[in-house]
Amino acid sequence: MNKGCGSGSDSCLSSMEEELHVLAVDDNLIDRKLVERILKISSCKVTTAENGLRALEYLGLGDPQQTDSLTNVMKVNLIITDYCMPGMTGFELLKKVKESSNLKEVPVVILSSENIPTRINKCLASGAQMFMQKPLKLSDVEKLKCHLLNCRS
């Protein structure tokens, strides 16, 4: 079913390039900039947030008075978040997104520098689309875009 996707096939990428808007969440500036750069190289529109609370604010879940939450939700096709962040972990962000009626369909990918099977399983069981090892690579983004394309078709 994934023919050509794992190899970076242009057909998989080209059909999503126009629409994929990613919210990238990481407390580490260097990691956040790396993710942003790789996503932009892959023709994604990128919005960044330095922590889970900022991400929730952007998505309209942080401030009850925020009125443009649906506008942002419609624009975000994917959330990529670091697992380990102060204040709110990527797992907690994942749970908030999946609890929201407006956001539960938005795929969430968790990034971590630690390969801990129980953590990975917990995230996947709670609705994460994928769990990826840091550092994020261009080939990871290509596979992810193809995976999302297959899920939508």
Curated annotation (Swiss-Prot):
Cited PROSITE patterns: RESPONSE_REGULATORY (PS50110)
Entry comment on modification after translation: Two-component system major event consists of a His-to-Asp phosphorelay between a sensor histidine kinase (HK) and a response regulator (RR). In plants, the His-to-Asp phosphorelay involves an additional intermediate named Histidine-containing phosphotransfer protein (HPt). This multistep phosphorelay consists of a His-Asp-His-Asp sequential transfer of a phosphate group between first a His and an Asp of the HK protein, followed by the transfer to a conserved His of the HPt protein and finally the transfer to an Asp in the receiver domain of the RR protein.
Keyword Nucleus carried by entry: yes
Pfam families recorded: Response_reg (PF00072)
Amino-acid biosynthesis recorded as keyword: no
Residues bearing the modification 4-aspartylphosphate: D82
One MF term in the entry's GO annotations: phosphorelay response regulator activity
Record localization: Nucleus
InterPro entries assigned: ARR-like, CheY-like_superfamily, Sig_transdc_resp-reg_receiver
Annotated SMART domains: REC
Alphabetical keyword list: Cytokinin signaling pathway, Nucleus, Phosphoprotein, Transcription, Transcription regulation, Two-component regulatory system
Annotated GO CC locations: nucleus
Main location group: nucleus
GO annotation, biological process: cytokinin-activated signaling pathway; regulation of DNA-templated transcription
Record domain Response regulatory: where: 21-149
Function: Functions as a response regulator involved in His-to-Asp phosphorelay signal transduction system. Phosphorylation of the Asp residue in the receiver domain activates the ability of the protein to promote the transcription of target genes. Type-A response regulators seem to act as negative regulators of the cytokinin signaling.
Family, per entry: Belongs to the ARR family. Type-A subfamily.
Name the UniProt record assigns to this protein: Two-component response regulator ARR17
Organism: Arabidopsis thaliana (Mouse-ear cress)
